[in-house]
């Protein structure tokens, strides 16, 4: 940018996103108002599938995602002396995890789900009173991603009833879908083709 500053006009902002992995950084940056006066926004990701020396601009349908923490609350009891008095939060969470991994795929596009952590229990002879599940869902569109969130919610409700426990769900982060602006794609492609050593990949990589 500095090498070409006398050829440029207007204002250019360079932003680096914190907390990308939990998809919290971009939301906070947008809420701060720092991009409110931007006419165009160019984003890049080091994990994209273009090779060195290539630029890919015709992107669409990056998977939306929602990160959720679900906590099941049961009732502790001695597993040997009085198990009937307990409500097993770990058993509820484990059952929910199995059901979540069996959610039917969506006919309109890709879906993903992963239960990455399940933390529970106080001791080997104690009915677990609390279980924390950390999971994520993904969908090709916002609607498909919401379908996955709804399915997870329905499973948690049913499991809570079946196991006599309660639960709470917290949204820890989310990312919406992406549709590139064709006018800007054309400008970037033309600039890329005019730059020695750069190959333009003019097709979706998804």
Descriptions of predicted regions:
Residues 1:
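Active-site alpha-helical elements of protease catalytic centers
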Residues 90-206:
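Metal-dependent amide/peptide-bond hydrolase catalytic core
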Residues 6-117, 122-126:
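Histidine/acidic-residue-rich, glycine-tolerant segments that coordinate divalent metal ions
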């Amino acid at each position: 940018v500095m090498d070409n500053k006398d050829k440029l006009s207007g204002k250019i902002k360079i932003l680096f996103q914190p907390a990308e992995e939990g998809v919290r950084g971009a939301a906070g940056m947008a809420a701060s108002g720092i991009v409110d006066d931007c006419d165009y926004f160019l984003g890049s990701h080091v994990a994209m599938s273009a090779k060195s020396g290539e630029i890919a601009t015709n992107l669409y349908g990056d998977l939306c995602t929602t990160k959720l923490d679900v906590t099941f609350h049961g009732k502790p009891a001695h597993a040997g002396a009085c198990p009937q008095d307990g409500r097993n939060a770990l058993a509820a969470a484990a059952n929910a995890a199995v059901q979540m991994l069996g959610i039917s795929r969506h006919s309109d596009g890709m879906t993903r789900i992963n239960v990455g952590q399940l933390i529970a229990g106080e001791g080997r002879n104690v009915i677990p009173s609390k279980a924390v599940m950390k999971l994520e869902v993904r969908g090709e569109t916002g609607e498909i991603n919401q379908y996955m969130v709804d399915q997870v919610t329905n499973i948690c409700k049913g499991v809570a009833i079946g196991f006599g426990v309660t639960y709470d769900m917290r949204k820890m982060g989310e990312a919406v879908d992406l549709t590139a602006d064709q006018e800007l794609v054309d400008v970037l492609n033309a600039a890329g083709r005019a730059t020695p050593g750069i190959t333009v990949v003019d097709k979706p990589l998804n």
